């Protein structure tokens, strides 16, 4: 026979010749009969009998007889009489001199006639799966003499099927007979050995290798493959035969499986009139993922059933531990086939199971803790307890889990209700003791409180009534000018200020008759419309650096830090980390707008080197308003950016964590000592550059005939260095200075970089506020402190580079006074005080 032409687009269903070729040749056995003829002949025999119930044994005998007649000598093979080669399992002949027993299903259920009703599906295994070892008997599970005699007699008479070869009864080894004959015998006599009499004889195991006994506890075996309908009784189910012969896809069976499982869940039992349940009350230990079901039969549970039906029982684990059957690796099942299983066990039977089923996937169910069910509230408490550091003792952990009191941690912090971290009283006192002099906390707190007092009137729910106007008259015109300017700032930040659902910014106060001022801000997020461009304002944090320099920072969205005034925290620095003092833990919008304007004003003023280019501060506010309104009298755009001056941009730098006690004592003190030396070194370098420039100018003027020989020399650096500040991680060194003209700092920065090997930054102080003459020249506290220290040390020791590189070593000698005794020049916070005084006089 010539094969039809096959190409890449050819399919069995489209090409008739190719389909016939596969059906006629490839699916034929040695007798010349095709596998597809077997179900058809079985149906013909069933139709001819005229009975509603199909007997698979009768159909099998007829088919075997027909195969024998045309088998060309196949009847001479003894195995055809004893073995169903399609079903793989032999049908047992009746034992002589013994009363005929009703048909016994291999699962152990007595049945008068084989049932064709489809009840449920079970995953089948392949013949390549390992066989489990036979159970080891103990004193409590011995067979009696009659049972053992019947077992030996049937063992000798049963044919063996191992792999792909047949073995005779007389020439087989005992080990080969133990694998299959013993399991078939025990499956047939399963009821007699697993009754309620207390016998613990192990039930036979499935060919997949499931153990049938563990720790003297009975284990139900996997079901043998069962036919789903009469057509499949004479063959073993496979994917190819189901698809090509029966035209049934596996998905259809899986769908039918789910329907049967729903019937079981509703308590529907198809076998109450067919099976005897007297022996189905014993409890068995089942394999993980295969729950208990009756006596030796498991229902087709999916692996995502409801977990935690019962806790694990360990009452009998210590008895007869030597009888445990070795656990073999399970093979993943691939094909569902029908089985004659009774209904699902009741809820009480499921609660008695000693083994918990496998946890479901992607299902939110209550979990268990120490064998007890845990509700949602307890689960949250357990999750909170897992985040508590291990350094806490058990008493604190118990208080945290019960939401009673606070937990004091070893690092000085306090865990509040298992959620938030804050500084303890002891740690907060340490912060105040170490940071009061270095960060000028007293002056910073006083300045901030005064600003908040002036802005408090604007936050009032009342308009300018008699009471508030009296307060303005009492304090002078400062409040009035500041409040008017605050309205300008709020008008420039409408995305943060106005409520989109209000009329022109007028918001009612709890339904009362009193209204807020025009342009007032509400923090109620529920009043905002999500479809517009209005942004909710998140309160910022106001912090102070050395000498009281103010900074606005943001906090992470999911932060658990509860900050207080006076705390020392670690923040994001310039490509590093820095240590700052918390001034205001939560800054409202008015204070944020005002501080942001002051910082931008100081920044633009510091860039102006010539004092004649500055605008008068008492006229600056009005000129800013005119520039905003587009009038003729306006600010020079080359000197001031009006938009940057008035608009608030949320800072990207954030507060990271609280500072540790070591950081605020040892590390901060070492940082202060390095800053004292850096100030001295910078002034020495500056003096050396100026002296070199002066001597060079003198030599050039004497050697040349030009009247102005200084034009050929480098100009002298006309600056005054006030202070030095290291970033906390020592990745940046900033020098603050005051100058009256434009200078070239490249030589100075080059010399400083050679010494410190870090980034050097020179920051100017505005020269229109007379800060140096008012707050520095007369006192110079930091410079005098260093000069007193120099008297006790040699200049070579102070100028040694190796000393700076080892300044954080354990052998470092501290020469500066303690942090709680130092007094510095608070010129940074003085810049803000002088600017506010001149702007709003």
Curated annotation (Swiss-Prot):
Residues 118-130, 337-347, 395-405 have a biased composition (Polar residues). Present with 259 molecules/cell in log phase SD medium. The keyword Ribosomal protein does not apply. It is found in: Cytoplasm; Mitochondrion. Residues 653-765 form the PSP1 C-terminal domain. DNA polymerase alpha mutation suppressor. This is Protein PSP1. InterPro entries: PSP1-like (IPR047767), PSP1_C (IPR007557). The modification Phosphothreonine is found at residue 334. The modification Phosphoserine is found at residues 31, 34, 36, 237, 520. Belongs to the PSP1 family. PROSITE patterns: PSP1_C (PS51411). Residues 305-323, 348-360, 385-394 have a biased composition (Low complexity). The gene is PSP1. Its main location: cytoplasm. Coiled coil: none annotated. It comes from Saccharomyces cerevisiae (strain ATCC 204508 / S288c) (Baker's yeast). Keywords: Cytoplasm, Mitochondrion, Phosphoprotein.
